[in-house]
Amino acid sequence: MRVLAAMSGGVDSAVAAARAVAAGHDVVGVHLALSAEPGTLRTGSRGCCSKEDAGDARRAADVLGIPFYVWDFADRFKEDVIDDFVASYAAGETPNPCLRCNEKIKFAALADRAIALGFDAVATGHYAQLENGVLRRAVDADKDQSYVLGVLTAEQLSRAMFPVGDTPKDRIREEAAERGLAVANKPDSHDICFIPSGDTRAFLGAHIGVRPGSVVDADSGEVLAEHEGVHGFTIGQRKGLGVQGPAADGQPRYVTSIEPETGTVRVGSARDLEVHAITADRAVWTSGRAPSGPVECTVQVRAHGGLAEAVAEAVDGGIRISLREPLTGVAKGQAAVLYRTDPAGDIVLGSGTISGTDARPNTQ
């Protein structure tokens, strides 16, 4: 097969490309330039799309003996990822930009160009397992990235390859060193690549501006503080509320709801965060078709953690999810990714974007 290897400049994508070469594929490496202004992306060894990373990717391609190119996706990235991120926060949601990048850039815009140029698949360094269209969790549970791939359609999965998902991260680093790849010990990236300072609130403030509102006690309705915009808050947040002292019962306060229309941020106790039911829109099913009835599954609502046993049902292009046990910190805009337990690695069934929650179990 002709394989386009998306090379971020990190160790995982370098080994993914190396494995594609070793498997006998005709491989070409590509690095995505995601900003028209390089200074707006993080620099240094911890980036995933910084200007230094392009050099690391090129050097890895040279070691592997494969052609290498840099493709400019800055405009698409701004429109589909950065602008979406800002708009979502302004609407009181909590988006995951890596998830959107996979959905709109790596496995859409990039994959479309690859197919148009005669490639059969795009290989990345994501930690997930994919075989015959079935997407599973990675062997290395600590590095599993199936959650941020749960938005991919059956068509997108049909042209994807994840060569490192069957191997623990420590072994990937060892393999990189054995192959003479200089990125073998390069630190992992963790933060949002287009926020170089790591200060998400400041970034959003610069893009959205001041939209004042009130922090209100969820029980009494008392105004506790003023704020400069709902984009500075997320469900379950405890710090940075601008509120002096604990609640009346002596317990910490948490953000329990965000109302962008009025600029109201409500805070309450930990018990007010419990969610028993979730509704999600923009449903995607990895099999290509929605299930005909209720499905026993596990739902994950954050990239790390937020797991619960559940029953999910496809409803009007969305998903209704009833939880077997409550979850906390569930925010609109997050993805709800559904899994079926399997000894070979839990299988991703599909996903939806959380549009609502309920403290009461679904009864329908």
UniProtKB/Swiss-Prot annotation:
Tell me where it resides.
Cytoplasm
| NCBIfam families in the record | PRK00143.1, trmU
For this chain, the annotated S-S bridges are C101-C193
Which residues participate directly in catalysis? C101 (nucleophile), C193 (cysteine persulfide intermediate)
Q: Which organism is it from?
A: Rhodococcus opacus (strain B4)
Functional description taken from the UniProt entry? Catalyzes the 2-thiolation of uridine at the wobble position (U34) of tRNA, leading to the formation of s(2)U34.
- Residues flagged as site, Interaction with tRNA: H126, Q334
Q: What is this protein called?
A: tRNA-specific 2-thiouridylase MnmA
